[in-house]
């Protein structure tokens, strides 16, 4: 093959690749309106203990790749509850995502974690004046948003929570730590557990103040082995139901199995990605 032929072939292949790329981008834009709602409501992602916004990247990128949104920012909150944004949300942004990062990420004072979450919501509200929002949380991030709700669920100045995705939540204790002995679910209809950890008892107030007929709740837990994700018993995760079922607009549980059902792998799990994408943004 002579030099001219090589150049011609290279040019042809380049044009083909560019065309395929543009077609792919157009298909992604089509998905935005065909398969997913077109909303200005932001979705906030909260990571777990000792973690960072990196733990949220797989889920967020899955949403972006699916064509849900092209607007992703990071909100970092320090130990003084001061919030810094990286990126901006345009006025016409569709389904914007906020990746929340706690610098004080090993603080097991859940009430304080809840105030860190409140600081992010407050700053987001002040800058963008959103009326509604969604939450996605993993592991201790669940405690952050639940204790946030315990203090601020009825705060009329904050955006109203619309959808809540809880992943690998340990609302009624962690194995080897604060898990009540012989924990079971006494009543599958109400979700009432047989025993309650100290933190769970503090959250019982949610049964009274959780927003009435406002929030759709998706509770995802992993059955990696022996009805546990390796760190949290399924019965602890499922204890969430008792706190919200009487007031939630809807409540559903999803059990995930397989190697990626392990506690720290759930936020890297394509099945979890699909569950939360369909729940939050599916038409």
Features from the language model and the residues they span:
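Lipid deacylating catalytic domains
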Residues: 4-12, 16-136, 140-283
């Amino acid at each position: 093959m002579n030099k001219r032929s090589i150049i011609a072939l290279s040019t042809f292949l380049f044009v083909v690749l560019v065309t395929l790329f543009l077609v792919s981008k157009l298909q992604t834009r089509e998905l935005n309106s065909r398969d997913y709602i077109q909303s200005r409501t932001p979705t906030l992602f909260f990571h777990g203990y000792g973690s960072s916004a990196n733990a949220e990247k797989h889920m967020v990128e899955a949403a972006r790749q699916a064509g849900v949104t092209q607007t992703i920012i990071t909100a970092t909150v320090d130990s003084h509850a001061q919030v810094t944004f990286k990126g901006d949300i345009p006025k016409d942004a569709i389904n914007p995502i906020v990746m929340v990062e706690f610098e004080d990420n090993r603080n097991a004072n859940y009430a304080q974690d809840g105030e860190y979450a409140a600081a992010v919501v407050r700053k987001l509200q002040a800058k963008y004046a959103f009326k509604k929002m969604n939450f996605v949380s993993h592991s201790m991030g669940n405690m952050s948003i639940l204790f946030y709700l315990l203090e601020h669920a009825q705060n009329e100045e904050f955006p109203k929570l619309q959808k809540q995705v809880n992943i690998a939540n340990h609302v009624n204790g962690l194995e080897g730590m604060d898990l009540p002995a012989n924990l079971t679910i006494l009543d599958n209809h109400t979700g009432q557990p047989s025993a309650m950890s100290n933190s769970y008892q503090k959250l019982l107030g949610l049964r009274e103040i959780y927003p009435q007929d406002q929030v759709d709740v998706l509770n995802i837990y992993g059955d990696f082995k022996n009805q546990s994700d390796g760190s949290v018993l399924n019965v602890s995760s499922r204890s969430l139901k008792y706190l919200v079922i009487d007031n939630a607009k809807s409540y559903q549980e999803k059990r995930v199995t397989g190697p990626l059902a392990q506690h720290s792998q759930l936020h890297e799990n394509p099945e979890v990605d699909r569950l939360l994408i369909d729940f939050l943004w599916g038409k």
